[in-house]
Amino acid sequence: MGQKINPLGFRLGTTQSHHSLWFAQPKKYSEGLEEDKKIRDCIKNYVQNNIRISSGMEGIARIEIQKRIDLIQIIIYMGFPKLLIEDKPRRIEELQINVQKELNCVNRKLNIAITRISNPYGHPNILAEFIAGQLKNRVSFRKAMKKAIELTEQANTKGIQVQIAGRIDGKEIARVEWIREGRVPLQTIDAKIDYCSYTVRTIYGVLGIKIWIFVDEE
């Protein structure tokens, strides 16, 4: 069971918390979900188009959304917020205007905050972006996976598993390759495991990257 299910949903309420915090009437629940997706897509597109760092990574670990009747509070957890912070007031103001246009919210105030995370390579989203960048630059998949594991070891994690699926290295038959370092106890609910699945488009086609990181045991 623990091998197949999404590790984040499996641990909600124990070691994982929700990234969206709000209440809605059952009839309006789908509208709230759609709004969240628009907010996250808008922020990611803005970061991608305006403040891309040299390695080609967005560096967003997660986006938390808290909604009240008259306020939408968005917290962006970033691994490399340097470029965003250099010109902080203008950047955030521009981002707020973009999100407000996307949502068309008149009666609600929008507030965006940026939080820097320590050990960015201990977060699977940022690590997946790193691997995707390597694969796009035609670096060998084994080399990319080993480098990713080296980076997580510096972030003091207890274990990592990386899986890449698709037409790896341009081979005609799609296959799945994976590597594990340390412990990754997927069946233990008390184990704090971070997970992400990421799609990367290469010249050979689409590849899927999945990363499990064992952070700690509670």
Swiss-Prot record:
Q: What are the protein's UniProt keywords?
A: Chloroplast, Plastid, Ribonucleoprotein, Ribosomal protein, RNA-binding, rRNA-binding
Q: Does the keyword Plastid apply?
A: yes
> Known PROSITE patterns for this protein?
KH_TYPE_2, RIBOSOMAL_S3
Name the InterPro entries on file: KH_dom-like_a/b (IPR015946), KH_dom_type_2 (IPR004044), KH_sf_prok-type (IPR009019), Ribosomal_S3_C_sf (IPR036419), Ribosomal_uS3_bac-typ (IPR005704), Ribosomal_uS3_C (IPR001351), Ribosomal_uS3_CS (IPR018280)
Task: List the Pfam families hit by this protein, alphabetically.
Answer: Ribosomal_S3_C
Per the record, the domain of life is Eukaryota
- Annotated disulfide bonds: none
Tell me which residues make up the KH type-2 domain. 47-118
Where does it live in the cell?
Plastid, Chloroplast
Q: Which GO terms describe its molecular function?
A: rRNA binding; structural constituent of ribosome
Question: Gene3D superfamilies from the xrefs?
Answer: 3.30.300.20, Ribosomal protein S3, C-terminal domain (3.30.1140.32)
BP-aspect Gene Ontology terms: translation
Please verify whether the record's keywords include Ribonucleoprotein.
Answer: yes
Q: Name one GO cellular component term.
A: chloroplast
Subunit comment for this entry?
Answer: Part of the 30S ribosomal subunit.
The family note in this entry says:
Belongs to the universal ribosomal protein uS3 family.
> What protein is this chain from?
Small ribosomal subunit protein uS3c
The organism named in the record is Draba nemorosa (Woodland whitlowgrass)
